[in-house]
Regions:
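C-terminal alpha-helical "lid/dimerization" subdomain adjacent to the S-adenosyl-L-methionine
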Residues: 127-175
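Short conserved loop adjoining the S-adenosyl-L-methionine
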Residues: 80-87
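A conserved beta-strand element that flanks and buttresses the S-adenosyl-L-methionine
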Residues: 94
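A short, conserved alpha-helix within the catalytic core of class I
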Residues: 102-111
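Conserved class I S-adenosyl-L-methionine
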Residues: 25-33
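Conserved beta-strand signature within the Rossmann-like core of class I S-adenosyl-L-methionine
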Residues: 118-125
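Class I SAM-dependent methyltransferase SAM/SAH-binding core
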Residues: 34-36, 40-80
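Conserved alpha-helix/loop element of class I SAM-dependent methyltransferases that forms part
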Residues: 7-25
Length: 204
């Protein structure tokens, strides 16, 4: 596979990197896969760490980043109890097409623990179609997305572990309202949603 490619997740990389650049500092990419987003974050962050549980993906990400000293790829599970003590907190925490692989509410709580004061959590996620409205919106997007995919020469299979989402967007909103009540969630193009949450500045 080419080092650079496009798909429905990569479509969000530019805005994620632009957002991270406003804070600089350090970035954590949870479920970093082959390291493409992590590599792009190194252009705007002094330190970039990727977490991935798939050993083959970790090997690919490390090859991609072998000449990037400020990047580190860890074969690790974000839900491990001692992870926050081991890796610390980050100005930007990203989680692209990964949250639906994890237990939703515990994962939201854990991701928030990894965000530094004044930092931001950025989730790009997939939601299950459960309501009539969900199905209608997905159906309306089919043709436009095929056109966009053809224009970008979409790469559908990048050789990483995938699974279908379990929770609907309504269920994700409800969970976020309990765990991260200030989170901003929006349905997006590309069968995705975004969740953004800012940790307040620490008051002395």
């Amino acid at each position: 596979m080419a080092d650079d490619y496009w798909n429905h997740n990569v479509a969000f990389h530019r805005r994620i990197v632009r957002d991270a650049a406003r804070r600089g500092g350090s970035a954590l990419d949870v479920g970093c896969g082959d390291g493409l987003l992590l590599a792009r974050l190194t252009a705007v962050c002094r330190r970039a760490v990727g977490l991935e549980t798939d050993g083959q993906a970790v090997a690919r990400a490390r090859r991609r980043l072998e000449r990037t000293p400020q990047a580190e790829v860890l074969l690790d599970d974000v839900m491990d109890l001692d992870l926050p003590q081991r890796i610390g907190t980050f100005e930007t925490v990203t989680c692209v097409a990964t949250l639906h692989h994890l237990p939703l509410e515990p994962a939201l709580a854990r991701l928030s623990e990894l965000v530094a004061p004044s930092g931001r959590l950025i989730v790009v996620g997939l939601a299950a179609n459960k309501s009539l409205w969900d199905w209608m919106l997905s159906a309306l997007a089919v043709l436009p997305l095929r056109v966009v995919g053809a224009l970008h020469r979409e790469t559908r299979d990048i050789g990483v572990v995938t699974r279908p989402p379990r929770e609907s967007l309504a269920e994700i909103r409800a969970a976020a309202s309990r765990i991260l009540p200030e989170a901003r969630i929006r349905r997006r193009f590309y069968y995705r949603y975004t969740l953004m949450w800012d940790r307040p500045m620490k008051v002395l």
